[in-house]
UniProtKB/Swiss-Prot annotation:
Location of the active site: 7, 68, 141
Pfam families xref list: RuvC
Family: Belongs to the RuvC family.
Subunit structure, as described in the record: Homodimer which binds Holliday junction (HJ) DNA. The HJ becomes 2-fold symmetrical on binding to RuvC with unstacked arms; it has a different conformation from HJ DNA in complex with RuvA. In the full resolvosome a probable DNA-RuvA(4)-RuvB(12)-RuvC(2) complex forms which resolves the HJ.
CDD domains found in the cross-reference section: RuvC
Keywords: Cytoplasm, DNA damage, DNA recombination, DNA repair, DNA-binding, Endonuclease, Hydrolase, Magnesium, Metal-binding, Nuclease
Cofactor field: Mg(2+)
Record GO terms (molecular function): crossover junction DNA endonuclease activity; DNA binding; magnesium ion binding
Organism per entry: Frankia casuarinae (strain DSM 45818 / CECT 9043 / HFP020203 / CcI3)
GO biological process, one term: DNA repair
Main location: cytoplasm
Gene, per the UniProt record: ruvC
UniProt protein name: Crossover junction endodeoxyribonuclease RuvC
Known role: The RuvA-RuvB-RuvC complex processes Holliday junction (HJ) DNA during genetic recombination and DNA repair. Endonuclease that resolves HJ intermediates. Cleaves cruciform DNA by making single-stranded nicks across the HJ at symmetrical positions within the homologous arms, yielding a 5'-phosphate and a 3'-hydroxyl group; requires a central core of homology in the junction. The consensus cleavage sequence is 5'-(A/T)TT(C/G)-3'. Cleavage occurs on the 3'-side of the TT dinucleotide at the point of strand exchange.
Length: 172
């Protein structure tokens, strides 16, 4: 299965694609960020994020998309920008009929390090090891996107089976 992980943000939106599956070691397909200038208007920045994610969807052809859930922060402007960029990714995936997994930072950390309280250095170290990379992906947004993709690769299929077995059938 090929998964696109999206670490949403307006200044830097991390994107990472991995391939893998049950009993198959995950490997890196592509990793990077979409950058927008902090001086640009929000609408312009969201369009740039949308164009960037859309290009990644075209180029890498994922089967699923994993997006970080927004969590409360002291800076409301940061929260709003993160939520807006995440919504762009969700809409683009939905328009293509791709399943979307939403994960909290602690769920992602637990999936890749075994601890929901891991710091960025621990997450980066594990991403480097799990994907057999020679160096850690930079910036941190790119590493976080790969962590999201791995989290979905490992947890997404089980969650889908659980949802389809629940009364009322599958939901998104």
């Amino acid at each position: 299965m090929r998964v696109l992980g999206v670490d949403p943000g307006l200044t830097r939106c991390g994107l990472g694609v991995v391939d893998g599956g049950l009993g198959i070691r995950a490997h890196l397909v592509e990793v990077g960020v979409v950058r927008t200038p902090a001086t640009a208007e929000v609408a312009e920045r969201l369009c740039a994020v949308s164009d960037g994610i859309d290009a990644w969807l075209d180029r890498t052809r994922p089967e699923a998309v994993a997006v970080e859930k927004v969590f409360s922060q002291a800076n409301m402007r940061t929260v709003m920008g993160t939520a807006q960029a995440g919504a762009v990714a969700i809409v683009l995936a939905a328009r293509r009929g791709l399943p979307v997994g939403l994960y909290t930072p602690s769920e992602v950390k637990a999936a890749v390090t075994g601890s929901g309280r891991a710091d960025k250095a621990q997450v980066s170290f594990m991403i480097t090891r799990l994907l057999g990379l020679t160096e850690a992906p930079r910036p941190a947004d790119a590493a976080d996107a790969l962590a999201l993709a791995l989290c979905h690769l490992w947890r997404g299929p089980a969650l889908a089976r659980f949802r389809s077995a629940a009364p009322g059938g599958p939901t998104r």
